[in-house]
């Protein structure tokens, strides 16, 4: 099991770094979605390794060939549904799952604080669970998430998108501000 735990942690670190590299490369238009995909993957692998370390199975009891979903793993590790880390991960997971690439570019500035919190949480949690200093793999100055432009106002969103999508975006933006 030690070998599986180590492989999960190693892959987790790689996914984490890849997410940061994608996000911080300004020429990539798919960077918000790419970051959310890789950062969630990094968390999933790191938390599964933490479960193994605690002596818990990472497989569904009724399907021993299938590992637990990231949602289940997050709930097992962060049992309090109001934990800031859990809320942060669930919001990024929601973004990853809905994959609204044509919308998220306009909200990059709103996602940046959420993503930055996720990065810092990962740094702290990989240290707590696995005693790993992430700066041994990536320089500390690369742990910063940067956003490059001002968000659209609610008025601009309403002019740019259909009423249904505009209201969804405004609601999503308000939720992000609460979590940041």
Which positions does each model-derived feature cover?
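A conserved mid-domain beta-alpha-beta active-site/ligand-binding segment of alpha/beta enzyme cores
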Residues: 155-180
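Charged alpha-helical initiation segments
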Residues: 1-35, 146-150
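Generic structural signal for well-ordered, non-transmembrane alpha-helical segments
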Residues: 40, 44, 90, 97, ...
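A broadly used, surface-exposed interaction patch
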Residues: 47-112
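Short, hydrophobic, well-ordered secondary-structure elements
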Residues: 32-52
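Amphipathic, Lys/Arg-enriched alpha-helical patches that create a basic surface
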Residues: 111-161
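Charged/polar positions within long, soluble alpha-helices
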Residues: 21-24, 47-52, 97, 101-105, ...
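Non-transmembrane, amphipathic alpha-helical segments
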Residues: 4-7, 27, 31-35, 81-84, ...
């Amino acid at each position: 099991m030690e070998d599986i735990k180590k492989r999960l942690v190693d892959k987790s670190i790689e996914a984490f770094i890849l997410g940061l590299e994608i996000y911080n490369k300004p020429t990539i238009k798919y960077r918000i979605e790419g970051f959310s995909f890789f950062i969630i993957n990094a968390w999933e692998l790191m938390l599964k390794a933490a479960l193994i370390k605690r002596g818990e199975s990472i497989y569904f009891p009724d399907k021993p060939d299938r590992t637990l979903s990231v949602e289940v793993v997050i709930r097992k590790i962060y049992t309090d549904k109001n934990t800031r880390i859990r809320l942060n991960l669930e919001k990024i997971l929601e973004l990853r799952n809905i994959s609204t690439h044509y919308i998220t570019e306009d909200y990059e500035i709103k996602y940046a604080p959420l993503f930055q919190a996720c990065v810092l949480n990962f740094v702290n949690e990989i240290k707590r669970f696995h005693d790993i200093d992430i700066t041994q793999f990536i320089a500390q100055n690369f742990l910063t998430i940067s956003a490059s432009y001002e968000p659209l106002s609610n008025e601009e969103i309403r002019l740019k998108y259909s009423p249904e999508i505009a209201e969804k975006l405004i609601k999503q933006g308000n939720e992000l501000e609460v979590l940041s």
